[in-house]
């Protein structure tokens, strides 16, 4: 297809370059002993998730719907963060998340034990002098 024939708006992905970059990130994971996660808020082109998931450990989601997308399309860990969690969302997140980061001690007190009982690791976001 000629470039002029591509409908707009369109995203054109160089899969070779994407895989090359993923290999670099995999090497970082191995050498640093850490996990590299795909930030879905910045990149949610799920058609490329099968390729990316070969190299990265999982995803980060900024809420329930991104977490659902991750669980459905990206074989790996699902990490979730949100400024606040609704009760109904938390019930679903308990079924699909591997790690949840809370934005306040209050949220951690409210949901932390329930998460741990469901086998989900938890974290607390700290912003010294800000929150």
PLM features per residue range, with description:
Residues 21-31, 69:
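A short, N-terminal amphipathic alpha-helix
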Residues 34-131:
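Active-site-proximal beta-alpha core segment in soluble small-molecule metabolic enzymes
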Residues 3-4, 22, 64:
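Residue-level detector of functional hotspots within protein domains
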Residues 1-12:
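Generic N-terminal amphipathic, Lys/Arg-enriched alpha-helix
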């Amino acid at each position: 297809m000629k470039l002029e024939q591509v409908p707009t708006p369109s995203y054109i992905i160089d899969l070779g370059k994407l895989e090359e970059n993923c290999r670099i990130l995999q090497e970082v994971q191995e050498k640093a002993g850490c996990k590299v996660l795909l930030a879905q808020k910045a990149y949610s082109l799920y058609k490329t998730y099968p390729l990316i998931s070969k190299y990265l450990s999982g995803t980060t989601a900024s809420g329930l719907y991104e977490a659902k997308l991750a669980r459905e399309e990206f074989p790996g860990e699902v990490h979730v963060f949100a400024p606040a969690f609704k009760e109904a969302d938390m019930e679903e997140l308990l079924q699909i998340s591997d790690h949840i980061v809370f934005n306040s001690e209050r949220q951690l007190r409210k949901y932390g034990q329930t998460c741990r009982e469901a086998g989900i690791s938890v974290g607390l976001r700290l912003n010294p002098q800000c929150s």
